[in-house]
From Swiss-Prot:
Domain of life of the organism encoding this protein: Bacteria
Pfam families: VirC1
Record key words, sorted: Crown gall tumor, Plasmid
Gene3D superfamilies linked to this entry: P-loop containing nucleotide triphosphate hydrolases
Name of this chain's protein: Protein virC1
SUPFAM superfamilies according to UniProt: P-loop containing nucleoside triphosphate hydrolases
Cross-referenced CDD domains: ParAB_family
InterPro entries: DNA_Partitioning_ATPase, P-loop_NTPase, VirC1
Species, as recorded: Rhizobium rhizogenes
Record's keyword annotation contains Manganese: no
Length: 231
């Protein structure tokens, strides 16, 4: 089982949204995915509840409460016993012993960020913290920045400047663009199943097209993540 962790010191950086998107892409490819909800607000638990009501939860996936060390250990042990292919961990903001344990146990670390001065500053702080932690533990874990809510059209001058600041860091080549499909995942459930349900309704043809484009974007990101895990 490969553990992928989404981490950021800043709340609202897009950790949970990125995790939901990658989960949908992996599940659509037939992968079994365990989700470790290490945020005390349990956003992944609420996501599953919403998805079950909408018939958009994939049975290949399961959410585990993991906001305490004992819960995390139990979640990891059970997920391995159940034979999940991947575990995706949603950390809480800031540094803690729990976050450090998750980071140090990961196979890949993703740091989501939007292209604003505040977000980039927090992403750089998170990246420095992660690298220092890995060095102190004598670990070499691939770490990359995932750009979030990137405009579909041209970037503003400020956004280009923020993107340039990331040039010296490992960055996932394909970003998650700013799309309603991504923003609505928390309420609608898993994107690939939402898309499947809409394909049967002719009145939803335009929305179905938008969801399909978003899903294709997630599949591209999941392939890049898979390549990073194989290096």
């Amino acid at each position: 089982m490969k553990l992928l962790t989404f981490c950021s010191f800043k709340g609202g950086a897009g950790k949970t949204t990125a995790l939901m998107g990658l989960c949908a892409a992996l599940a659509s490819d037939g992968r079994r995915v365990a989700l470790f909800d290490a945020d005390e607000n349990r956003p992944l638990t609420r996501w599953k509840e919403n998805a079950l009501r909408s018939n958009t939860w994939d049975s290949f996936c399961e959410v585990y409460a993991a906001e305490e060390m004992s819960l995390l250990e139990a979640a990891y042990e059970d997920a391995e016993l159940q034979g999940f292919d991947y575990a995706l961990a949603d950390t809480h903001g800031g540094s803690s012993e729990l976050n450090n344990t998750i980071i140090a146990s990961s196979n890949l670390l993703l740091i989501p960020t939007m292209l604003t001065p505040l977000d980039i500053d927090e992403a750089l702080s998170t990246y420095r913290y992660v690298i220092e932690l890995l060095l102190s533990e004598n670990l070499a874990i691939p770490t990359a920045v995932l750009r979030q809510r990137v405009p579909v059209g041209r970037l503003t001058t400020s956004q280009r400047a923020m993107s340039d600041m990331l040039a010296s860091l490992p960055v996932v080549q394909s970003p998650m663009h700013e799309r309603d499909a991504f923003a609505a995942m928390k309420e609608r459930g898993m994107l690939h199943l939402t898309l499947l349900n809409m394909r049967t309704d002719p009145s939803m043809r335009l929305l179905e097209r938008n969801l399909r484009i978003a899903m294709e974007e997630l599949v591209t990101i999941s392939k890049l993540v898979g390549e990073a895990l194989e290096r």
